[in-house]
Amino acid sequence: MRVVVGIDDTDSHRGGCTTYVGYLLAKEVLRRWGAGAFRDFPRLVRLNPNVPFKTRGNAAVALDLEIPEGDVEELWRLAVETVAAHSRREGKTDPGVAMAAGGVPERAKTLYRMALTQVVSISAAERAGVLTWGGRGKIGAVAAVGAYFPKSTFELIAYRRGDREAIPPDLVRLLEALTYPYTFHNVDRRRVLIEPRGPDPVYYGIRGLTPQHLRYALSLLEAWGYRPAGWVIYRTNQATDAHIELGVFYGDPLPYSFYRARGLVVEARRVAGRHLVGRLDSGLRFVAYRHLGRLASELERCLRCDVVLYGGLKPRRGGLYLYVERAYVLGRYIPARSRCTYCGGSLESLGRGRGWRCRRCGAVFHSAPIRWLYDTAPRRALLPRPGEWRHLLKPPDVDPTIPNFFSPSSAEWIG
């Protein structure tokens, strides 16, 4: 029988990691039911990063399994016991578990689409038609059960025992040179991106498109002495634009949702800290942080540009602000003087208050209003520097259809 188990919210700001609990659960499933129980790689499901209840990256984990029907209750007990034993119950942490047996309900799939962009209630998760346990974490757990990946990437997550030893940037650049574009987002200038900076048990995480290239990257780091205590390859919706292609968008801006807004930039100015604050002609205000790099600097020069902005909506100073994560410039409105209505010739001024005269036919006009021309030459995408990419953002050089050709039987995926 097909059974999908989801877990979420097992970590806190002081430690822990939901992917690590998923790794431990996957090891137990392997021990009891063998590798044949896995219909797919374990899934790392990124959700709306703007919700105020998240710990760090707002990720849930799911296992898509095939086990005997009589073992379903045993699997449920195993999942609940594993989460309960390894959760960090501190601060906002409120772990949850969800399970669907025999098939995934459509309501769970809909909840996944909502959780990519919106704030979802616990009651909505409880009505999704799957078995649940725990607190607020059941929202992400149900979303992970309902997650489906038309496009995907992989991430090899290695776990540490003891202190995290820093990996030199030069070694990470070598790793990327040997594996790019089949691994990506490894280093940004001198900043190593594969190592987290928090107190969680993750040693490093390498994103890629094939399990084989990820295993090669792992062996390269091991050869240089950076050996993890354990590792697992997750299939994930990272770097796929899943929130844009599958997420639910509402017409009205809602707090803590991921939002898409099109409009004319009528204001863009730097404030304290060199952050950019601006406004669209609709009245929606937006913010682009200085450390976004080219995205903020180019958006500053986009006055009178027709743009599409993507980002998270957050309350600020009594209103909602869109915190920009990416932008698309569709065109710019350029002022141009009206031409002669008789012959189409250009007009010259006769002096202040005296009107305008056609250079070609001599016709005189009392006024020459400005015409606005729409220029599509500036059309381009504005992306942040790699170190500031959100997890779901798809880099322009990544093909998230490649991972669809791989299954757990095609490569070693856990160790």
Swiss-Prot record:
<comment type="similarity">
    <text>Belongs to the TiaS family.</text>
</comment>
<dbReference type="InterPro" id="IPR013696">
    <property type="entry name" value="TiaS_FLD"/>
</dbReference>
<dbReference type="Pfam" id="PF22641">
    <property type="entry name" value="TiaS_TCKD"/>
</dbReference>
<keyword id="KW-0067">ATP-binding</keyword>
<keyword id="KW-0963">Cytoplasm</keyword>
<dbReference type="InterPro" id="IPR053870">
    <property type="entry name" value="TiaS-like_TCKD"/>
</dbReference>
<keyword id="KW-0436">Ligase</keyword>
<dbReference type="InterPro" id="IPR024913">
    <property type="entry name" value="tRNA_Ile2__agm2C_synt"/>
</dbReference>
<dbReference type="GO" id="GO:0002101">
    <property type="term" value="P:tRNA wobble cytosine modification"/>
</dbReference>
<dbReference type="GO" id="GO:0005524">
    <property type="term" value="F:ATP binding"/>
</dbReference>
<protein>
    <recommendedName>
        <fullName>tRNA(Ile2) 2-agmatinylcytidine synthetase TiaS</fullName>
        <ecNumber>6.3.4.22</ecNumber>
    </recommendedName>
</protein>
<dbReference type="Pfam" id="PF23783">
    <property type="entry name" value="Zn_ribbon_TiaS"/>
</dbReference>
<dbReference type="InterPro" id="IPR055394">
    <property type="entry name" value="Zn_ribbon_TiaS"/>
</dbReference>
<dbReference type="GO" id="GO:0016879">
    <property type="term" value="F:ligase activity, forming carbon-nitrogen bonds"/>
</dbReference>
<dbReference type="GO" id="GO:0005737">
    <property type="term" value="C:cytoplasm"/>
</dbReference>
<dbReference type="InterPro" id="IPR046349">
    <property type="entry name" value="C1-like_sf"/>
</dbReference>
<keyword id="KW-0819">tRNA processing</keyword>
<keyword id="KW-0547">Nucleotide-binding</keyword>
<dbReference type="Pfam" id="PF08489">
    <property type="entry name" value="TiaS_FLD"/>
</dbReference>
<comment type="function">
    <text>ATP-dependent agmatine transferase that catalyzes the formation of 2-agmatinylcytidine (agm2C) at the wobble position (C34) of tRNA(Ile2), converting the codon specificity from AUG to AUA.</text>
</comment>
